[in-house]
């Protein structure tokens, strides 16, 4: 998982999405303390959104490891981290920053390798890791057509169920285990000296090894104990991704046009949707959440001189997201003896939700001197649920000597509500946990999606 590498960089933590500590055994990449929901993960510049297929809890957590484990470490060429205002041009979900995982290029010579890796912790209660992978890359037609393929099998055992013993009856679980299977291929066609066409395809299966986590560290039920003792696989994530990229290198500048499609099937045991047992497994029959993301993007980088050197970047994007998660919409209103209807929301609630987003952005990288750069930018988004938003930004950097680089900036960042938050059929019930708006009086209440939510903004 690349999160273990990224966490060593300045401004990077591994946390949950809130300060509750819920799902603390599944920490995700968090930039500048803004939370994983405000950290955008990219693979070769394309957003990865599989974690969005996981239901969001009352406190804003998700039962997910995030999207940092889809590419084997051996296949990564570099990892770029953008923090704060510099990430504004990437739009919703990048309020904290962006992590771009760049995979290895197609090689000009035919070559391949097999990798074996093992890690055995000194403490026998911590999970060991074993991994095997391969890659093969080279030309099919020299200087015209090339390919790359890689595969990976990885297993990290779960921490022992009693690794945090001493907390009474609470189930403060250790780190959950994971089984990964990945395979990916690339065809690269150099159409002309100025144009390259790249076709990417990948498939991954990610399953867990359960060790007793219940979100709220509830006393373990017989079901939870049985699943933990058997090291059961309680969640299986299947991710398929396809993309077609056209790169152009022209006399006037560079262009990149991308069509990408990502499909995630999130198969997991059903979870409680009310009170303290919310997030704890309640049965043995798997349910599914399906998420589809279609994206078109176009970008041009145009160098020019206006007193000093400039590089103007202009781009546009369109995304279409569709979610179908009927199991997470099964909570009713009957718990308080009322009919299962409220404010026009009937007892028959669907799990389908969709969202579209159109965006355009402009950025100018101005080289005031060889060591000083000024970068004004602006981005416009229109979301089918939450409406329009403008995100201006101004960034500055100055090189001081060989070892020091000073950076600063200001921006209006933006986060659109997710597909659960905007779906009025999505309901959670606090039961005996109290209502956040009147917590001292322990009033019960419902969390409901709202199609009229506005985006979050931050300066």
Task: Describe the residue ranges of each PLM region.
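Short acidic/polar hinge/loop motifs at secondary-structure boundaries
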Residues: 47-83
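Transmembrane beta-strand segments that form the barrel wall of outer-membrane beta-barrel proteins
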Residues: 112-120, 154, 373-383, 390, ...
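Outer-membrane beta-barrel signature, preferentially recognizing the C-terminal barrel domain
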Residues: 222-246, 349-355, 399, 403-405, ...
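Extracytoplasmic beta-strand/coil segments of soluble accessory domains associated
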Residues: 3-51, 77
